[in-house]
Curated annotation (Swiss-Prot):
Belongs to the cytidylate kinase family. Type 2 subfamily. One of its GO terms (cellular component) is cytoplasm. This is Cytidylate kinase. It is found in: Cytoplasm. It comes from the Archaea. The keyword Cytoplasm applies. ATP binds at G7, L8, P9, G10, S11, G12, T13, T14, S15.
Length: 182
């Protein structure tokens, strides 16, 4: 089974992906973690690294191509990333997580150890803007078009365990009556 988990920064995609990976024993690959690691390796903030990636498409395309290649050759995998629902066309279940910006910013401040919410907001909005432009330019993908997703969940009011239970119900149903991936 191939599952993609996508959403904007701070929506909980990495947490849910880890949960599902542990629960089902699936391999997990994460574009966000790869991107954050690359930024760190270049001694850059995420927004700064995003601007670099905006100038040189090789960064995004390398991460995206690698994820797609691994996912399409693998079974029992969770592919986490903003574009994974678009890139992994043969996924059995494509999930989009969303949460209001205030919720996402609180999570980002904690996760990335940013000094305050206003700083996190500036960084996050710039990052989202840069990414949206790149996705449109590179792949003609509108990140706000969720039509490829099978399951869209608001992560604001549920913790990862509760979200995991909702997704588990979908996975269990798919195991009973699989459908052709769209």
């Amino acid at each position: 089974m191939r599952i993609t988990v996508s959403g904007l920064p701070g929506s909980g995609t990495t947490s849910l992906s880890r949960y599902l990976s542990e629960r089902y024993g699936f391999t997990m690959i994460s574009a966000g973690e790869v991107f954050r690691q690359c930024a760190k390796e270049h001694n850059m903030e995420l927004a700064e690294f995003g601007r670099l990636a905006e100038k040189d498409p090789a960064y995004d395309k390398m991460i995206d191509a690698r994820q797609k290649e691994i996912a399409e050759k693998s079974d029992n995998i969770i592919v986490e990333g903003r574009l994974s629902g678009w890139m992994v066309e043969n996924a059995d279940l494509k999930i989009w997580l969303f949460a209001p910006i205030s919720c996402r910013l609180d999570r980002i401040v904690f996760r990335d150890q940013i000094a305050d919410v206003e700083t996190a907001k500036a960084i996050t909005l710039e990052r989202e803007h840069c990414e949206a432009i790149r996705y449109q330019q590179y792949y003609s993908i509108d990140i706000n078009d969720h039509s490829v997703y099978h399951l869209i969940l608001n992560s604001e009011h549920w913790g990862v365990d509760d979200l995991g239970k909702i997704v588990a119900a979908a996975i269990d149903q798919l195991k009973k009556t699989p459908f052709a991936a769209s």
